[in-house]
A protein has these predicted regions:
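An anion-engaging/catalytic patch
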Residues: 1-112
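FIC/Doc superfamily catalytic core
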Residues: 95-291
Length: 291
């Protein structure tokens, strides 16, 4: 199966397919058009691209000849041939749009892979595509440290290390550093035989927030590994809205019902489906993007 990547600009998807033979990504033209026009209507994006392609062809633009076609999954779940462009082609396309959004898009597009998140996401892809994932302890603090260490090794000097400082987010203070070791032992010993128990364990680990940074990205992988081992399930994160997820996680400190519901509705038995896990990584990192 093709390797799929999803990036997000202003909460809109930009999908890409990996070309193994040429070692590069091909990006969906219609996704880029939708982003640049701030338009979610598929038909309008398709018609605009048809118009623009004709215009560029008349002008003798290299962009049209650089366009390729690859299969991508549509809204109906089926795969269809769609126009795609490589990295340089996307920049050319963006530069043909006469609006301020295009310049911001180009800045985001050319910079996003070089950020800590961009480099960490590449490491997350590699983790799932290697045998290393099979060596991670499931449901333990050690396993979570292994995940964090792999995702952020070489990016943070505290990668894979339990924090020794107390941290807060907004008005909420996570587990005090002096009690964190004891709290993590309690969480590790929590049962994980049922879905309810697994969600409870996940919520408690989030409240503990054992690392200085990178907790959510690491803990979502940790959760999926528990679900896979215990229930032969995993979460299809692409089915969980970012705002709803973040709100549910905030509420989970006093009420776990919202996050329980979101996770339950997104459960899938596609535990060996490569695309499901790759999309999961994309969405997991998307949750952490600042609005």
């Amino acid at each position: 199966m093709s390797r799929i990547s999803i990036r997000f600009f202003n909460d809109r998807e930009v999908r890409a397919v990996w070309d193994e033979a040429n070692s590069k990504w091909w990006f969906s033209v219609l996704d880029v058009v939708g982003v640049l026009n701030a338009q979610d209507d598929y038909t309008k994006n398709r018609n605009y691209w048809k118009y623009l392609k004709t215009k560029l062809k008349k002008e003798g633009s290299q962009l049209v000849s650089a366009t390729n076609q690859l299969k991508m999954t549509a809204a109906d779940g089926k795969r269809y041939l769609t126009d795609v462009l490589d990295y340089n082609g996307v920049i050319l396309l963006a530069n043909s749009f006469p609006n301020a959004r295009a310049s911001r898009f180009v800045e985001w597009f050319t910079y996003s892979d070089e950020t800590i998140d961009g480099r960490s996401k590449s490491k997350a892809y590699a983790l799932f595509e290697s045998s290393l994932i099979d060596n991670i302890e499931v449901g333990t603090v050690k396993g979570l440290k292994q995940i964090h260490g792999y995702l952020f090794g070489g990016l943070y000097d505290f990668a894979g290390q339990i924090r020794t400082k107390t941290i807060s987010k907004g008005d909420f203070t996570f587990c005090l550093a002096e009690y964190l070791g004891r709290e993590l032992q309690k969480i590790e010993s929590m049962p994980e035989d049922t879905f309810d128990q697994i969600v409870a364990k996940y919520v408690e680990m989030n409240v503990a927030h054992p690392f200085m940074e990178g907790n959510g990205r690491s803990t979502r992988i940790w959760l999926d590994l528990i679900l896979k081992k215990r229930l032969r399930k995993c979460v299809d994160w692409s089915r969980i809205n970012k705002k709803e997820y973040l709100q549910a996680m905030q509420e989970s400190v006093v009420n776990t019902a919202p996050i329980h519901r979101l996770l339950a509705l997104a459960l899938t038995d596609k535990i060996n489906d490569r695309e499901t896990f790759m999309k999961g990584i994309d969405y997991s990192y998307y949750y952490e993007q600042e609005d």
